[in-house]
Amino acid sequence: MITFADLAEPAPGAERCVDRQLWLACAGGMCTVPPVGAAVYYFPQGHAEHALGLAAPELSAARVPALVPCRVASVRYMADPDTDEVFARIRLVPLRAAEDGDVEEDGAAAGEEHEKPASFAKTLTQSDANNGGGFSVPRYCAETIFPRLDYAADPPVQTVVAKDVHGVAWNFRHIYRGTPRRHLLTTGWSTFVNQKKLVAGDSIVFLRGDGGDLHVGIRRAKRGFCGGGGGAEEASLPGWDQYGGLMRGNASPCAAAKGRGKVRAEDLVEAARLANGGQPFEVVYYPRASTPEFCVRAAAVRAAMRVQWCPGMRFKMAFETEDSSRISWFMGTVASVQVADPIRWPQSPWRLLQVTWDEPDLLQNVKRVSPWLVELVSSMPAINLSSFSPPRKKPRILAYPEFPFEGQLLNPAFPPNPLAHGHHHYHHNHPSFFPFPDVSAPAGIQGARHAQFGPSLSDLHLTHLQSSLMYPGLRRPDHVGPTSIPPPRISTDLTMGSSPPARALSMGAKKPDDAKPPGLMLFGQRILTERQMSLSGTTSPAATGNSSLNWNTEKGASEGSGSGVIQNSPTDNTSSERLQWFRENSTVSELGLEPGQCKVFIESDTVGRNLDLSSLASFEQLYGRLSEMFCIDSAELRSRVLYRGATGEVRHAGDEPFSEFIKLARRLTILTDAGSDNLGS
């Protein structure tokens, strides 16, 4: 049996290790390295990005899994002998299927938290880096990091001895002089600058160890851009490291190549091969290389992937300046949830979130982030409540024993605990890692939750939902056998009285002939939908329910064969499907709309905005108002606005006189693609 002690033994003649505290100070305040014994996930995709993507084709050809659960066997903190750039050699032991449960136990890592020692970093100015000049020491550093200076002497002066990352001692003359008086390093500083080849923009780090010893380290500045391809996008943020210590990514390949030149493609392929085969392996990590950590604490990954990420979620993320002098939080919004590289890594959560920022100018090149690097602020997409009608009392829905409620939107296709389901078996048996939780909830609760926000989630067209809201890998679970009849569904949205049973009866389940049509009750009085009221004008009250039921049943029969609610077929943005979606969703409740008002929807949106048509006099004014509301050129709107006519067919705005249009239109839909102009038959 291989033990951690055996794995941790360094080979004879191994490179000299750096003091851990000094290493962390040089790496940056937000850099984290998992301690020995910690459970981590190793991401080969992130490792390839760390190596400038040199071995990505070889990894994809070898069918390396998206992530491998491991335990840290040893960590060696080291520094480049020429540049002083710090890096770590991390030895990992993959966990087998029988040990997958151990990934939850991270107790060994919790005990290795150390108090950070006093340290200070300063970016060198042109004066500091001049040959023959001195170093201006900030007062905080001189009084808290350096040994105490005897201010009674004239002038106050002392010799400061500091050891670098290689253990070499450097002597500096520390003096307090000038007008105004300031702390300076004079004699010995020029030698240090010349030997270390420091330039303006580099940072110097002073640290006082636990024993009182003084240490000095270096953080090299990134040297511009070199163009050419690489594994990451080029950064153009002056002063800001694109991913800080938390997520140093999307920086210039040329700038990062200085520290990552030793991450060879063959080493990357070998590490991935050993990891896939369940053998111990070693990786080299450069914390200043402007890419995220690819050995991530398992607890952080699992916690992040339990969140049901969807567009519109608000989050915050920490960034630090390139010299690691300060850390700031930036707010952002999830724009989409999709795999970053579906060809090579189709099941990888690495950089799963495509994001937009509240301050896009500062973070213009940070387009994708991994879920475990952000902190969720709001799980509900931002909704403009001003466009909704005033809250109304929620009528209760009649209970029908033959229609059991189903308030569940959709279930994930991935197990809640992939490790417990044999996540890592080697030999390429690696299911996707998306442990979203079960989101089932009582129908009454979900109905109340969504009553004042328009259509309930259970009434939305699921193929539309999969393509626009959820991660593409999610699908409706196939609980129904080939010959069994699934349980029918009924809408849990208490504000929708005109939902056709075509969506309520899933997979063509038939409703008994003697069943009463669904209705709404408010204070003991039945509430009729507009369609039921229109039918009651020409038929007797006793026949009203049957007429409505027959109409809905016929409509359900015509749509049953193409029900996209349960089908797992991929969603196509064709004209016919868009028209079908418009027809299925055009029966939005008109309760609360005054005469001359309507709801306006962007195609595939489930939340509309109110528009007073009575205040408009022509289609030109209509297009102008819509252009202001949605920031779309009015000329493009002429062929993109659809509405439902009196006879139920979908028409273009402008097919009827504007006076008739005002009377009939209760829902407008703006197509996002001009090519979907085909209304079909």
Swiss-Prot record:
Compartments (UniProt record): Nucleus
Keyword annotations of the record: Auxin signaling pathway, DNA-binding, Nucleus, Transcription, Transcription regulation
Tissues/organs with expression: Expressed in roots, culms, leaves and young panicles.
A GO molecular function held by the record: DNA binding
GO cellular component terms listed in the entry, alphabetical order: nucleus
A GO BP entry: regulation of DNA-templated transcription
Record's compositionally biased regions (Polar residues): 534-555, 564-577
Classification via SUPFAM superfamilies: DNA-binding pseudobarrel domain (SSF101936)
Ranges where the PB1 domain occurs: 595-675
Region Disordered: start-end pairs: 474-518, 534-577
Residues of the DNA-binding region: 120-222
InterPro entries found in the cross-reference section: ARF_dom, ARF_plant, B3_DNA-bd, DNA-bd_pseudobarrel_sf, PB1-like
Family: Belongs to the ARF family.
Record remark on domains: Interactions between auxin response factors (ARFs) and Aux/IAA proteins occur through their C-terminal dimerization domains III and IV.
Described function: Auxin response factors (ARFs) are transcriptional factors that bind specifically to the DNA sequence 5'-TGTCTC-3' found in the auxin-responsive promoter elements (AuxREs).
Quaternary structure and partners: Homodimers and heterodimers.
Protein name: Auxin response factor 8
Gene symbol of the encoding locus: ARF8
